[in-house]
Amino acid sequence: MKKKSFLILLTLIIVKSSFAQLKSPNASPRSNISQIIGLVSVNLDYSRPSKKSREIFGGLVPYNKIWRTGANNPTTISFSDYVKINNQLISAGKYHLYSVPTESTLDLVIYEKTDACGSLPTFDKSKVIARVSSDFIDLPNTVETFTISFENISNNGSTLNIMWDNKLAIYNIDALTKDKMINNINNVMNNNPSTNDYSRAAMYYFEEDIDIEKAMEWINKAYKDSDNLRYWHLRYKALIYEKAGKLNKALEYAESGYKRAIESKAVDGINSLEIIYRRLSEK
């Protein structure tokens, strides 16, 4: 019986070993980037080949031919809400990201996601969602590994940067945040807003220069003057009152906030409120 059990175990080990696969590094490793831009969640999935002393644009990546914008499977990008890329509207969804290089430009093609692998021989025009272009910028250094990144991120958008070898292409993403935020704020303000709602609305109107009077109204509803205000509440009020031109009141808030930050031993609060206080003291 023991001999039989041993033979069964040995057989299982041999069978398992026969299906084992040797793992090795991928020449073009996959990269996945998740980025919040404004109110939009963006996910980018692509492979990253390296230069390895090869000529890239006009060589490995031929001019005027469809490129998968990376290696292996086509690059994919998804948006949780509609955006604009170089002023072309893109609906929420998941897309393939192809490109077509020339000597001086890189056209980016947002394409309906399909089961295609690798590059396409031609585009099906009915599947082209948008085609946008960027002039190549010559870089002073060589980028060894193909890189796509989101840069210059703000409340309202970012850039999509594509770099490889000594070339950079930049595309503007507009997250259309302002219209969405104003609509959201109006809806919230009509439905029993909380302290946090008033504070966020006030700071958004302040940061985006929409309506500083309304920002003051909301920040005062969020944080009524009292001895219980925290240093960051006073920082918000100082900034908003400063922009509104009410400098004496802004200075008062900055000074009080600075003292409370010291009491709380909050280094970041101390540093930021000291800067605001000194700036206001010099006006």
Question: What label would you give each PLM region?
Answer:
Residues 1-25:
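Bacterial Sec-dependent N-terminal signal peptides
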Residues 21-62, 114-195, 267:
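Primarily secretory-pathway and cell-envelope proteins
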Residues 76-78, 84, 90:
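Structural recognition of beta-strand segments within beta-rich domains
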Residues 90-99:
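A short tyrosine-centered beta-strand micro-motif
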Residues 185-249, 260:
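Alpha-helical adaptor scaffolds
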Residues 213-216, 248-251, 270-274, 278:
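Conserved positions within tetratricopeptide repeat
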Residues 233-243, 266-283:
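TPR/TPR-like alpha-solenoid helical repeat scaffolds
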